[in-house]
Design a protein with these regions (language model features):
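A residue-level signal for conserved active-site and pocket-lining positions in enzyme catalytic cores
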Residues: 65, 180, 248
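Active-site histidine-anchored catalytic micro-motif
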Residues: 2-52, 87, 93-197
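Short, mixed-charge, low-aromatic patches
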Residues: 3-11, 64-70, 89-91, 130-136, ...
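Short, functional N-terminal and low-complexity linear motifs
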Residues: 16-23, 74-81, 98-101, 142-148, ...
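Short, surface-exposed amphipathic charged segments that create phosphate/polyanion-binding patches used
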Residues: 78-85, 163-167, 204-206
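Metal-dependent C-N hydrolase catalytic cores
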Residues: 3, 48-116, 290-298, 308-310
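Conformational coupling and interaction surfaces
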Residues: 2-4, 23-24, 31, 171-175, ...
Length: 312
């Protein structure tokens, strides 16, 4: 086995995804074998440019970045540009054009990585699950080759950020979520509830982190400009929350989770007020076997320490 842990990251790169990538790029104990990009927070072309810019900023052009699905399996794409800005990166004037991804499709790259690193690969998903569902449809045996799948998505308290009960990543492509939940993959969910409670960056923390003064530190805070406005106006948080970075922090160091549960999860695919809701059987009413680990609580201080180390 390799001494480095192989990670494949799938992302719809916008402001919080980019910080999660910064955190992964900073690690010397991880081999990022590929980054797949999917439409979600922003259209695919923008998500690609955001990933490529972040890769360049971190000096990690050795890591391949692949274009994936540009739309959900069935529904039309709905983006979160009202949350992250038109460009997904806070609309602060970054030069987000002109970079080309690696040749090949994200789904093919994921399948190849699952074969090359069978039994070792950690898959981290930061966006809609379209690419993952397509990989499962292509080769269901992928479930036997991946060691961990850490997903940013859903919410154990069933509070939503795109409708009353659905988290955005799950809402965008609920049919993909259903395929993933039924796949047998070893799933570990870090939900929006964890982000709202355990990964909120209050203004004092944001100022301190930015004052580290590195390009990565300034980038990490500056691209949250539109997100911070959204959180103050709509989600009523004391600062801005960091869903994808807390998921990445857990993928890197599972001890950041202070409580987890094994639960049965199903999703609502139908259009309507509960589209994209991931129903977690917290009391075991259904009697169905658990199909996922769900993080219930995380250590905010440990998260901040990991983030600070990555941007210093």
């Amino acid at each position: 086995m390799s001494t480095l842990r192989p990670f494949f990251i799938d992302t719809d790169t916008a402001s919080d995804d980019a910080v999660a990538l910064v955190m992964a790029f900073a690690r010397d104990d991880i081999n990022i074998v590929g980054i797949g990009v999917v439409a979600g927070n922003v259209p695919l072309a923008s998500a690609l440019q955001n990933a490529l810019y972040t890769r360049e900023l971190c000096g990690r052009t050795d890591v391949p970045v692949y274009a994936g699905a540009d739309r959900p399996l069935i529904y039309e794409l709905g983006t979160a540009q009202h949350v992250h800005g038109d460009d997904g990166m806070g609309d602060i004037g970054l030069p987000l054009t002109g970079r080309a991804p690696n040749e090949g499709h994200a789904v093919d790259a994921l399948l190849e990585a699952s074969n090359e690193y069978a039994g070792e690969l950690t898959l981290v998903t930061l966006g809609p699950l379209t690419n993952i569902a397509l990989a499962i449809q292509r080769d269901p045996s992928i479930a036997d080759r991946i060691s961990r799948v850490v997903l940013m998505g859903a919410a154990a308290d069933h509070i939503g950020n795109v409708n009353p009960v659905a988290e955005f990543n799950m809402w965008v492509d609920p049919h993909a979520v259903q395929i993933v939940l039924e796949s047998g993959l070893p799933l570990e969910f870090v939900g929006w509830d964890i982000s709202r409670r355990d990964a909120v960056i209050v203004p004092e923390e944001a100022n301190r982190l930015r004052s580290i003064g590195t390009p990565r530190a300034e980038f990490t805070i500056d691209i949250q400009r539109i997100v911070a406005e959204f959180c103050a106006r709509d989600t009523k948080l004391a600062g801005f929350d960091m869903p994808d970075p807390i998921a990445m922090a857990y993928a890197i160091d599972p001890s950041i989770a202070t409580q987890t549960r094994h639960l049965n999860l199903v999703t609502e695919c139908a259009e309507g007020p509960t589209r994209g809701m991931v129903v977690m059987d917290l009391l075991g009413f259904t009697g169905r076997e658990p199909n996922a680990v769900v993080v219930m609580h995380a250590d905010h201080s440990a998260f901040i320490r990991q983030l600070e180390a990555a941007i210093s």
